[in-house]
């Protein structure tokens, strides 16, 4: 049996990742591939509990290093409990965020250093990296406006950061992308939902049909 595919969706707040994952999941399963969708931090009981600590608006005093370590801990447990077993069974895994989020948010936007945060996460995940990461690129002003207009979304601690923080997140993602463009594909998220989904399908189609079928 062939190993599955680990596909990650990355981007700032309000870029449309979650909506896109739902649509891509439907597309993949309609084509008779076995697929699961999951998220970070979260996806399993322990990591969801860590998520509540990280994202709670009550924890405004959280230190940046504490934040980075909590993300890495949640990532480790999610990886070994959910992602690796699925990949070993030949399943396509769609994950909302992975290591690149930590590099952009904590490494760059929080000024901890991309290499330092990479080191923490390498300890957590070992050699497990995404087969492909889709980076949703969007002006943070547009992303935050989308969040403000979305009554269904629960606002978390990162959502209420100042615009300057979100601009640094975007800059951080751009650095990570340039250093990893062998596995990261950037798309323009300032488009219609249909256009964004079609961009992703065109990126993933050859990868899925070549490696799984």
UniProtKB/Swiss-Prot annotation:
InterPro entries: P-loop_NTPase (IPR027417), Thymidylate_kin-like_dom (IPR039430), Thymidylate_kin_CS (IPR018095), Thymidylate_kinase (IPR018094). GO terms for molecular function: ATP binding; dTMP kinase activity. GO terms for cellular component: cytosol. One of its GO terms (biological process) is dTTP biosynthetic process. Keywords: ATP-binding, Kinase, Nucleotide biosynthesis, Nucleotide-binding, Transferase. ATP binds at residues 11-18. It catalyses: dTMP + ATP = dTDP + ADP. Pfam families: Thymidylate_kin (PF02223). HAMAP family: Thymidylate_kinase (MF_00165). Belongs to the thymidylate kinase family. Phosphorylation of dTMP to form dTDP in both de novo and salvage pathways of dTTP synthesis. This is Thymidylate kinase.
């Amino acid at each position: 049996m062939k190993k599955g595919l680990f596909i990650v969706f990355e981007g700032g707040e309000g870029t449309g990742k979650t909506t896109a994952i739902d649509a891509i999941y439907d597309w993949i399963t309609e084509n008779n591939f076995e697929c699961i969708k999951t998220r970070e931090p979260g996806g399993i009981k322990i990591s969801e509990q860590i998520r509540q600590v990280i994202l709670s608006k009550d924890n405004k005093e959280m230190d940046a290093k504490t934040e980075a370590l909590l993300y890495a801990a949640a990532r480790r447990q999610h990886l070994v409990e959910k992602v690796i077993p699925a990949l070993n069974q030949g399943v396509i895994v769609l994950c909302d965020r992975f290591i690149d989020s930590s590099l952009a948010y904590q490494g760059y936007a929080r000024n901890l250093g991309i290499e330092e945060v990479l080191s923490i996460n390498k300890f957590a995940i070992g050699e497990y990296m995404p087969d492909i990461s889709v980076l949703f690129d969007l002006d943070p002003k547009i992303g935050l406006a989308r969040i403000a207009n979305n009554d269904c979304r629960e606002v978390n601690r990162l959502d209420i950061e100042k615009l300057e923080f979100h601009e640094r997140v975007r800059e951080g993602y751009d650095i990570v992308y340039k250093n990893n463009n062998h596995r990261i594909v950037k798309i323009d998220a300032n488009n219609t939902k249909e256009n964004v989904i079609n961009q992703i399908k065109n990126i993933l189609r050859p990868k899925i049909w070549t490696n799984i079928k």
